[in-house]
Amino acid sequence: ILRCLVGSEMCIRDRVFTVPEELNPIIYSNQKLLYDALYHAASSTLNELAKDSKYLGADIGYICILHTWGSAMNYHPHIHTIVLGGGLDKDSKWKDTGGKFFLPYGFIAKVFRGKYLCELKSLWNDSKLEFHGTAEKYQNHYCFKELLGECYKKDWVAYCKETFNGAQSVINYLGKYTHRIAISNHRIKSMTEATVTYAVKDYKNKGQWKEKTVPGEEFIRRFLMHVPPKRFVRIRHYGLLSCRNKSKKMAHCRNLLGCKKYISALKNRSATEMIKLLYNIDVCRCSSCGGKMVSHLPDKHTPSVLAHMRC
């Protein structure tokens, strides 16, 4: 899909859609349904506002990625949307607003709020929701209505996290950020028979790293909260970047903008060349003597073993 992105001339942004923490219990009890609702609300918001001539008046393309965690592995479901900086108008001509993002931050959050809560209410009315743990009280009509009222009063957050310049920066972002899990090994600092200590970002202190220690069972509980439902698709493509449109319409966009098609630096490379290019590790060089390694295959009289490298 990323080979369909245009070159360095196009501005690409990461728009983040979040929900208030009051919804966390009911979302966690209905992960598949209410994660899908996040995608529905985010995509409907972007499509509707982008097509409005007051903002852009064009069909846009974007990628949606679900994240469910905060730095401390707390439950924080939100959607990242990587949005092209323009789109095709009704005459199939490219239209953008220069370097400025075409949708107002405050208004987009209000539209997203309305669409998400509308789908949530519809699911409740159709008795499609389950209620577990602290969400059990929302089976009651009055409690659920009170929850909706609280969420409508709140200012939801839909902010622009990062601006990309061209396809390569998007690829770097996707590779390093969107495909990660709730925590990586290097953040786990120490453990005992009873506790685990790991690094978290303190956003109240300018994003400084600090260490947090929790019981082992609590660490496992936090990690398992972020295992997605079976066969759940976390990365989804829409508009100009959808599978149906990406080949023809993105080629048309490149022609209109005079951009070169992105060609991966890894194309037609061998596995050893890819490792060298990505990690600067030469697997064909002996780590002990520095000599060049060659493949060594055993002869027919030697017990069958895998081929290995020798210098």
Name each model-derived stretch.
Residues 294-299:
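Short Cys/His-rich "knuckle" micro-motifs
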Residues 287-288:
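Short, cysteine/histidine-rich loop/knuckle motifs that typically chelate Zn2+
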Residues 25, 34-64, 71-200, 204-242, ...:
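Conserved His + Asp/Glu catalytic blocks
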Residues 258-276:
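Short Cys/His-rich Zn2+-coordinating modules
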Residues 1-12:
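Single conserved hydrophobic/aromatic residue that forms the stacking wall/gate
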Residues 13-38:
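Signature for HUH/AEP ssDNA processing cores
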Residues 8-9, 300-311:
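Short cysteine/histidine-rich metal-coordination sites, predominantly Zn2+-binding motifs
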Residues 283:
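Residues immediately within or flanking Cys/His clusters that coordinate Zn2+
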